[in-house]
């Protein structure tokens, strides 16, 4: 289950590796945000974002 409460509060912070604001993933080192930035494919495990770009290779 996703440890973040972004869908409820609009904000989350997962162990310092991911920050999600207004359901917008700003920076992720691993899958932890239930929301993805525009242009990022959402994976079953969530979304892995490096910077503000995301492609199939960053999903795990």
Swiss-Prot record:
Amino acids binding a divalent metal cation 2: 6, 12, 14, 25
InterPro entries for the chain: Metalthion_dom_sf (IPR017854), Metalthion_dom_sf_vert (IPR023587), Metalthion_vert (IPR000006), Metalthion_vert_metal_BS (IPR018064)
Protein residues bound to a divalent metal cation 6: 36, 40, 43, 59
Classification via SUPFAM superfamilies: Metallothionein
Region (Beta): 1-28
Gene3D superfamilies, A to Z: Metallothionein Isoform II
Binding residue positions for a divalent metal cation 3: 14, 18, 23, 28
Stretches that traverse the bilayer: none
Chain residue ranges for the region called Alpha: 29-60
Pfam families hit by this protein: Metallothio
Keyword Transferase: no
UniProt-annotated binding residues for a divalent metal cation 7: 49, 54, 58-59
Positions bound to a divalent metal cation 4: 32-33, 43, 47
Residues binding a divalent metal cation 5: 33, 35-36, 49
Annotated GO MF terms: metal ion binding
Binding site for a divalent metal cation 1: 4, 6, 20, 23
Entry comment, domain topic: Class I metallothioneins contain 2 metal-binding domains: four divalent ions are chelated within cluster A of the alpha domain and are coordinated via cysteinyl thiolate bridges to 11 cysteine ligands. Cluster B, the corresponding region within the beta domain, can ligate three divalent ions to 9 cysteines.
Role: Metallothioneins have a high content of cysteine residues that bind various heavy metals.
Family the entry assigns: Belongs to the metallothionein superfamily. Type 1 family.
Name listed for the protein in its UniProt record: Metallothionein A
Gene, per the UniProt record: mta
């Amino acid at each position: 289950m996703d440890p973040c409460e972004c869908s409820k509060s609009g904000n989350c912070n997962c162990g310092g590796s991911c920050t999600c604001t207004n359901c917008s993933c700003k920076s992720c080192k691993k899958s932890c945000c239930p929301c993805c930035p525009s242009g990022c494919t959402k994976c079953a495990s969530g979304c892995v974002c490096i910077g503000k770009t995301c492609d199939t290779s960053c999903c795990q």
